[in-house]
């Protein structure tokens, strides 16, 4: 059994609830999709009104793939690359050269792991603090959604009420596209 969070809206807030589900090991897309289906079945088992959306390149839903940080673009660059390239560390960064790499290569660049403690994000000549912890990621993600998707596609986010990212492990990471998609839904729910 594995555990992953799902993000939803409750009483005007984005909330996270962890679900246990059967994990299908392996790197094949089919294995990831079996794990996603298992996670979504656990969510639906707990809430019969659940309409979960996996937000990643592993999603079976076109909308989930389009909302992936590996597909969204901002100023012609993939969102994942912008996020990784904007990191400022004690001994290096930002690393604008990461904008030109494939997203998975940018995410795995050694400098991101060997430059000391993360101190800020720098994007478009503006520094973003580390607190609140997700402010920079949420900002560029929402901007990229607006920049990449058509209005009807953005509105379609409201058709879902749970958001997941099978690759997101809260023990290893802070930012997730699933939570930021839930923020977008919250904005629609509260402000139209």
Which ranges hold each PLM region?
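Short, extreme N-terminal leader segments that mark the start of a protein/domain
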Residues: 1-55
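Compact, well-ordered interaction domains used in eukaryotic information-processing assemblies
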Residues: 54, 59-66
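A contiguous catalytic/ligand-binding core that recognizes phosphate-bearing ligands
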Residues: 66-68, 77-147
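A short mid-domain helix/strand-loop element embedded in enzyme catalytic domains
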Residues: 142-165, 177-179
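Charged low-complexity "KEKE/polyampholyte" interaction tracts
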Residues: 186-191
């Amino acid at each position: 059994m594995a555990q992953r969070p799902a993000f939803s809206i409750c009483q005007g807030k984005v909330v996270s609830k962890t679900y246990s589900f059967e994990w299908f090991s392996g790197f094949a897309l089919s294995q990831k999709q079996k794990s996603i289906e298992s996670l979504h079945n656990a969510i639906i088992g707990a809430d019969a009104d659940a309409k979960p959306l996996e937000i990643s390149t592993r999603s079976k839903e076109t909308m989930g793939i389009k909302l992936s940080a590996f597909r969204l673009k901002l100023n012609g660059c993939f969102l994942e690359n912008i996020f990784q390239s904007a990191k400022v560390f004690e001994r290096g960064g930002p690393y604008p050269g990461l904008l030109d790499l494939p997203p998975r290569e940018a995410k795995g660049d050694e400098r991101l792991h060997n430059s000391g403690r993360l101190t800020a994000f720098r994007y478009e000549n503006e520094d973003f603090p580390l607190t609140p912890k997700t402010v920079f990621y949420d900002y560029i993600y929402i901007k990229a959604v607006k920049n990449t998707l058509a209005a009807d596609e953005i509105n379609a986010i409201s058709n879902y009420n749970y958001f997941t990212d099978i690759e997101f492990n809260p023990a290893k990471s802070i930012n997730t596209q699933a939570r930021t998609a839930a923020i977008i839904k919250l904005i629609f729910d509260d402000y139209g």
